[in-house]
Amino acid sequence: LYNKEYEKAADCFKNVITSNKYALYDDYAELFKPGGDESSEMIFAIQNIGGVGKDHGMPMCFYMGSRETYGSCWNNVMVATTFVDTYENKDGTPFNWEDWFPGFTTSDDVKDQTFRAELKNNKVKTYPVAKDKLLEMYEKRDPRMSASIILPYTQYTGWHANSIEYCEYVIARGINSGKGY
């Protein structure tokens, strides 16, 4: 589909359906636990079975996460926002930023007002006015989005100074990735 080879994709999809080998799994989160790679939903799976590094900060997090995700390294590899935008609304309609934040797709100021927090001494001084609306928007999207992606102003379990640390993904200017930002 991404390459816009729709006829070829439709043929492949038809083969998957008519094979009767695959079906949607009841619990999305269970797909990512041991045994999930053998579920009826998995067509191609790479299972993370743990035991490498820390349970809260596997090697991929080390290379792609923030300092809080693993306790060191960098945070310059992120999922493309265009990919995140492909997650539909729960009702199956396409997601559109303009429905939530008019002017978002054309104005950097609107994007700034929507996402930018202000920090003081590595603490959030002021959240963006739109924080609650963002969280509401996430709730109304396909739940697989928030199960798969750390979204701005959501909480996640990180790893700092050899212990679990609960973190919030905050967007701000003039900071580095130390202490969760």
What are these regions (language model features)?
Residues I175-Y181:
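Long, K/E/R/D-enriched contiguous segments that form extended
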